[in-house]
């Protein structure tokens, strides 16, 4: 694949322009956190040298990490100085053994605020914001000045994305056959992406998807639908975006559904688009605008309903189109849905059972991706943004219809 889901800087939106950054920094997607140690060596020359881009000879030791695409993603085991500033994380993205991009994260708002809060719990949010802005301004200024010295030219303004809501603007410096792309979003992150100029794109769609006409895309999605002997009809190939401890269920599930459709914007990039300022709250976010924009960037049609409609949903799922549902959540019901994924029969939809459904408006909200159904048993099959163990959960359609309050149907 031409590039991997990225994010950085405002948890950057990506494009083949910003490739190689895994979905969630700090291990939220991949499990255990890997923290490279900081060193004072300068790796700048090594990362832009011909030996790296022609012979695939990268400096230092790199650790392979899982990726959502077919690319190989590696993280550098140290944080050196690059273009005048210490890095926070450095990633390399390779396709079939060929280096495609190097992404350097300098500053991440989530990591910054988490670390400061842990080390100094008495520090108030206003002083933290002032400290972050000061750090942000220093890093941005240093990087741009150093890049100007290297390239001996001013940057060109560029962008990726078709919608005002998710479009990201960058400063591109040209250095031989390479583009050095600075992504700096005040209030979020700062990163630098190094790539071949020939790989620059203005769309978030994967290179493969962008080459297909809609009829071909629909055919590919249809081929992901599998019918099993027990009557289950399921969509295969929807990736897992783990939300970790953040209030990202609506964002992670959107990312899962749209990545499946060919969009290469991860949860963090979408969070930035939804105006998530910091990681501990979804307050003030513009979620409905985000869903509409993500669908448009996916070159897909989004139709929104209120309560889940089982009859309508079947028509979408049979064609390989995913559905995201916002619903009210109950821990007790969740245990039943988990058990059903392991083969335990769901309780019958009796009056006594219905009493336990979380239908109250003050019940916690949650988002799930509907991936299949069984018409014979009247069950829906769904997944959560909690990890691979949260796939193939089951719920009676009546329960989902009663507990849902927004449904998003995607189609090509």
Model-derived regions, located:
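Noncatalytic regulatory segments and standalone regulatory/sensor domains
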Residues: 184-186, 190-230, 348-362, 369-412
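Structured segments of extracytoplasmic/periplasmic soluble domains
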Residues: 142-149, 255-264, 293-297, 315-320, ...
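Solvent-exposed loop/turn segments at secondary-structure junctions
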Residues: 244-247, 256, 277-281, 308-310, ...
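Surface-exposed patches in mature extracellular/periplasmic domains of secreted proteins
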Residues: 154-155, 264-271, 301-312
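Active-site-adjacent substructure of cysteine-protease-like catalytic cores
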Residues: 309-383
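Long, charged/polar, surface-exposed segments that mediate recognition or autoinhibition
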Residues: 21, 70-161, 340-342
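Active-site-adjacent structural segments surrounding the nucleophilic cysteine of cysteine proteases
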Residues: 18-64, 167-296, 361
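Classical Sec-dependent N-terminal signal peptides that target proteins to the secretory pathway
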Residues: 1-20
């Amino acid at each position: 694949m031409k590039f991997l889901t990225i994010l950085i800087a405002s948890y950057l939106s990506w494009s083949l322009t910003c490739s190689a950054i895994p979905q969630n920094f700090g291990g939220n997607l991949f499990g255990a956190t890997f923290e490279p140690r900081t060193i004072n060596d300068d790796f700048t020359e090594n990362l832009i040298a011909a030996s790296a881009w022609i012979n695939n000879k990268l400096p230092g030791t790199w650790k392979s990490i899982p990726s959502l695409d077919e690319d190989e993603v590696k993280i550098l085991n140290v944080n050196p100085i690059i273009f005048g500033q210490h890095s926070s994380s450095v990633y390399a993205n390779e396709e079939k053994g060929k280096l495609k991009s190097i992404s350097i994260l300098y500053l991440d708002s989530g990591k910054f605020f988490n670390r400061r809060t842990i080390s100094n719990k008495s520090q108030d949010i206003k002083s933290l914001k002032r400290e972050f802005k000061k750090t942000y301004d220093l890093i941005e200024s240093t990087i741009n000045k150093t890049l100007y010295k290297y390239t001996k030219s001013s940057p060109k303004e560029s962008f990726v994305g078709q919608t005002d809501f998710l479009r990201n603007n960058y400063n591109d410096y040209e250095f031989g056959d390479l583009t050095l792309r600075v992504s700096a979003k005040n209030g979020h992150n700062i990163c630098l992406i190094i790539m071949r100029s020939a790989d620059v794109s203005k769309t978030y769609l994967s290179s493969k998807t962008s080459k297909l006409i809609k009829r071909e895309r629909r055919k590919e999605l249809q081929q992901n639908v599998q019918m099993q002997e027990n009557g289950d009809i399921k969509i295969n190939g929807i990736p897992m975006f783990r939300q970790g401890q953040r209030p990202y269920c609506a964002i992670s599930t959107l990312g899962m559904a749209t990545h499946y459709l060919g969009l290469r914007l991860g949860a963090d990039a979408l969070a930035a688009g939804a105006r998530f300022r910091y990681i501990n709250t979804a307050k003030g976010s513009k979620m409905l605008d985000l869903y509409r924009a993500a669908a448009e960037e996916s070159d897909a049609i989004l139709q929104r309903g209120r309560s889940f409609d089982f009859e309508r949903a079947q028509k979408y799922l049979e064609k390989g189109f995913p559905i995201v549902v916002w619903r009210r959540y109950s821990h007790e019901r969740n245990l039943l849905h988990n058990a059903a994924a392991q083969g335990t029969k769901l309780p019958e939809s009796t009056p006594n059972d219905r009493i336990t459904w979380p239908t109250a408006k003050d019940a916690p909200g949650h988002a799930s991706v509907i991936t299949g159904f069984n018409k014979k048993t009247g069950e829906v099959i769904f997944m959560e943004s909690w990890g691979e163990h949260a796939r193939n959960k089951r719920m009676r359609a009546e329960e989902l219809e009663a507990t849902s309050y927004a449904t998003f149907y995607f189609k090509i």
